[in-house]
Amino acid sequence: MTRSETLFEQAKKTIPGGVNSPVRAFNGVGGTPRFIEKADGAYIYDADGKAYIDYVGSWGPMILGHNHPSIREAVLKAVHNGLSFGAPTELEVIMAEKVIEMVPSMDQVRMVSSGTEATMSAIRLARGYTKRDKILKFEGCYHGHADCLLVKAGSGALTLGQPSSPGIPEDFAKHTLTAVYNDLESVQSFFDQYPEDIACIIIEPVAGNMNCIPPVPGFLEGLRALCDKYGALFIIDEVMTGFRVSRSGAQGHYGVTPDLTTLGKVIGGGMPVGAFGGKKDVMQYLAPAGPVYQAGTLSGNPIAMTAGLAQLDALCADGLYEELAAKTKRIAEGFKAAADKHGIPMAINYVGGMFGFFFTDEQHITRFDQVTRCNMDHFRAFYHGMLDEGVYLAPSAYEAGFLSMAHGDKEIEETLAAADRVLARMK
């Protein structure tokens, strides 16, 4: 047995399913998950010492690459001052100012410890502010594992064939309306039924938990207009896209202004950090300024703030996002070219530092139902072929891929050469 196989069997005795987040268990592709011992730059190294070119990046945060020197050194220095205080710090203020500078739609921001906390709190704030109960989300979009958001969700829930989870009371779930992503008519139909009951729309501006689905032209703008018309708040969930699609996130890339934004992943530099923020009049409804309660023992943790600030500072370098987008385009279009060469149907999507590939005869993938019809046997074969070649992709057909600034010509060329060999064997 490999060391990963031994560790997985050991883990299953004490951890449900052997993992602490379901998609890591490889249920979507079969086989044994790789247990990782270390990471550096564009590479991760498993418990057996094998190196992989990594396109998961801890599910998005590692935009500069693993173990980046500036983040590592900042964290090591900060540790000497203590790990957690449970009291306000100057670092929180500096972080808030930095986030607001980079995301102009925010007047104020609240730090939390995860993306789930961010979306859960933003939903509560929207309900409290509007005094309405219903929320509208989109089929296949994932906003963390809060009860109201695990209805027809994406990510691991979709991978496991459980887009809705047991344990969510029907009386609670009935307040969650689920529309079709990239379909404004489906959204309008809910506002026709509940014109004064919908507190907010929440959306992944690039759906990264049903693979990678960018918005069609006019879709985000249409949602903004509907929220304005019916008095609902527009929440853009940038936990995945924030500081990855552009310096100001997907909202900056597409030119759409939300009422509230949720953040996670990149903002923490690899540490557990989330945030939500928006217009001052809405944020002032949050305790202790207002009546909507939200709190967290480790919110604004000084080590996490240090890591996040080091990463955000580095992301302000000129030309960084243009370079990252060019690398991402090269990988996605390289996969497509190799698939075409070997007669294997494939469609691709990419935006900023995110990409997706789909084994399908359809040319353009814009909806959840198209993703569910893709050839999963081809995906599993490609996944394990690439893993054997030393390329680590997301172990699910419903997750986006991520590049980092550490991926250079060598890594990209080796990845595309591996894809060519694997696809040749799949013919």
From Swiss-Prot:
Reactions catalysed, as given in the entry = (S)-4-amino-5-oxopentanoate = 5-aminolevulinate
Cofactor(s) recorded in Swiss-Prot or TrEMBL: pyridoxal 5'-phosphate
Q: Might you give the EC number(s) for this enzyme? A: 5.4.3.8
Listed GO biological process terms = protoporphyrinogen IX biosynthetic process
Keyword annotations from UniProtKB, A to Z? Cytoplasm, Isomerase, Porphyrin biosynthesis, Pyridoxal phosphate
- Which GO terms label this protein's molecular function in UniProt? glutamate-1-semialdehyde 2,1-aminomutase activity; pyridoxal phosphate binding; transaminase activity
Modification N6-(pyridoxal phosphate)lysine, positions: 265
Asked if the Swiss-Prot or TrEMBL record annotates the protein with the keyword Isomerase, the reply is yes
**What binding partners and quaternary form does the record give?**
Homodimer.
Protein name as catalogued: Glutamate-1-semialdehyde 2,1-aminomutase
Q: Which organism is it from?
A: Shewanella amazonensis (strain ATCC BAA-1098 / SB2B)
